[in-house]
């Protein structure tokens, strides 16, 4: 079964949960390291999604600065 890709919002929510758990300090060292590693992966995912969004937004404006209509995928 294929794994569903996380949305930006899902990744941020999971990252916030991890940060709260790490700040709490009640997890074992091993669990903390696992959460930290997952947090790094989620951070990279979020950065990639933001870069993709930035590139899409850059295409909305032509080189001359003239705005063109923005159409989201599937609309």
From Swiss-Prot:
Which GO terms are recorded in the biological process aspect for this UniProt protein?
A: DNA catabolic process
Q: Which InterPro entries match?
A: Exonuc_VII_S, Exonuc_VII_ssu_sf
Broad enzyme group: hydrolase
Task: Report the locations given in the UniProt record.
Answer: Cytoplasm
Quaternary organization: Heterooligomer composed of large and small subunits.
Family in the record? Belongs to the XseB family.
**Which protein are we looking at?**
Exodeoxyribonuclease 7 small subunit
Look up and give the organism this protein is from.
Listeria welshimeri serovar 6b (strain ATCC 35897 / DSM 20650 / CCUG 15529 / CIP 8149 / NCTC 11857 / SLCC 5334 / V8)
> Which gene is this protein's source?
xseB
